[in-house]
């Protein structure tokens, strides 16, 4: 049986993740409050951020930036802003 959560990002009841993907308190918060669909959306945004801003995950400052953006995206209804990016639907 699938574990259901009320997703804070999508504001609906949806299937939760099978296990905690991020360590620590933030990971617990994500596991308890974010659904699979919202996590998949975040992973796409995360990839864009890493590529467009040329982030190096070995750099602590870059990891901190990515974590801040993740928290804004998942819990504060923020969206990832990438300078010069125009979504395909707006071209």
UniProtKB/Swiss-Prot annotation:
Which Gene3D superfamilies does the record associate with it? Answer: Fe(II) trafficking protein YggX
GO CC, sorted alphabetically, is: cytosol
Recorded GO MF terms: iron ion binding
Query: Do you know which InterPro entries this protein is assigned to?
Result: Fe_traffick_prot_YggX, Fe_traffick_prot_YggX_sf
Q: Which GO terms describe its biological process?
A: cellular response to oxidative stress
Its signal peptide is none
Q: Which UniProt keywords apply?
A: Iron
Q: Which family does it belong to?
A: Belongs to the Fe(2+)-trafficking protein family.
Q: What's its job?
A: Could be a mediator in iron transactions between iron acquisition and iron-requiring processes, such as synthesis and/or repair of Fe-S clusters in biosynthetic enzymes.
In its UniProt entry, what is this protein called?
Probable Fe(2+)-trafficking protein
Source organism per UniProt: Tolumonas auensis (strain DSM 9187 / NBRC 110442 / TA 4)
């Amino acid at each position: 049986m699938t574990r259901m959560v009320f997703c804070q990002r999508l504001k609906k009841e949806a299937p939760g993740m099978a296990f905690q993907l991020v360590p620590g308190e933030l990971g617990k918060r994500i596991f308890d409050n974010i659904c699979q669909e919202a996590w998949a959306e975040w992973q796409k945004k995360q990839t864009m951020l890493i590529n467009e801003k040329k982030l190096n995950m070995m750099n602590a400052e870059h990891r901190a930036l990515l974590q801040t953006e993740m928290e804004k995206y998942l819990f504060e209804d923020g969206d990832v802003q990438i300078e010069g990016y125009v979504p395909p639907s707006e071209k």
